[in-house]
């Protein structure tokens, strides 16, 4: 079976619309796909209807941007099987979207003040098509270099990392609350790419809050991560999931879908 349970669209920080993603999925023989846009379930109903017409089963999803305050690390929680407008998630994530949008506007102002040739209207247009303005929108308005290129990565790191003029983050929700809320809204709470964010240590606490899955297969995971996730899944009786973390032109993964191991 070919599936993908971690995909982003223009509703958050992806470059492709729901329709573009699903058309690609259908062409590649993807049977099941979850849209897991950051901190929003917007558009899932229409996406599911489009998926039915194209022969792709669309699973409602979300990726909650969260934090482990005890260890000082970012944590991402996938919610699979949730519906558009899921009330508890909307209440939890709404403030995150507001903070991210305000921070991105601040970053845009810093770029303009510093004299960078940034297409402000293009950035704002991309933000309007999404649920808020993202760094990826600012980069798209700043350079035509493709995401995987060394020039893109160098520019991004110089501006948004390591003390650059746009290096400012926002406050996130507690990862434990994220798990509880996904469960409250009827979804399967999954620890996303723990190898990428080194969030393994938090897993026992999240299980106590209702965590039901762990993302084993992810482009940033090594074989050691695969093995560790499999072992933890058995120990804590978790479902193993996998996905591409596809962002279109705003990411390094070229396409959606992967073959689920037997």
Curated annotation (Swiss-Prot):
It catalyses: alpha-D-ribose 1,2-cyclic phosphate 5-phosphate + H2O = D-ribose 2,5-bisphosphate + H(+); D-ribose 2,5-bisphosphate + H2O = D-ribose 5-phosphate + phosphate. Its EC number is 3.1.4.57. Its cofactor is Mn(2+). The keyword Hydrolase applies. Pfam families: PHP. It is an enzyme of class 3 (hydrolase). Mn(2+) 3 binds at residues 63, 76, 193. Signal peptide: none annotated. GO terms for molecular function: 5'-3' DNA exonuclease activity; 5'-3' RNA exonuclease activity; metal ion binding; phosphoribosyl 1,2-cyclic phosphate 1,2-diphosphodiesterase activity. Mn(2+) 1 binds at residues 6, 8, 63, 245. Mn(2+) 2 binds at residues 13, 38, 247. InterPro entries: Cycl_ph_dihydrol (IPR048205), PHP_dom (IPR004013), PHP_domain (IPR052018), Pol/His_phosphatase_N (IPR003141), Pol/histidinol_Pase-like (IPR016195). Keywords: Hydrolase, Manganese, Metal-binding. SUPFAM superfamilies: PHP domain-like. The keyword Manganese applies. SMART domains: POLIIIAc (SM00481). Belongs to the PHP family. Involved in degradation of methylphosphonate. Catalyzes the hydrolysis of the phosphate ester at carbon-1 of 5-phospho-D-ribose 1,2-cyclic phosphate to form ribose 2,5-bisphosphate. This intermediate is then hydrolyzed to ribose-5-phosphate and inorganic phosphate. This is Phosphoribosyl 1,2-cyclic phosphate 1,2-diphosphodiesterase. It comes from Eggerthella lenta (strain ATCC 25559 / DSM 2243 / CCUG 17323 / JCM 9979 / KCTC 3265 / NCTC 11813 / VPI 0255 / 1899 B).
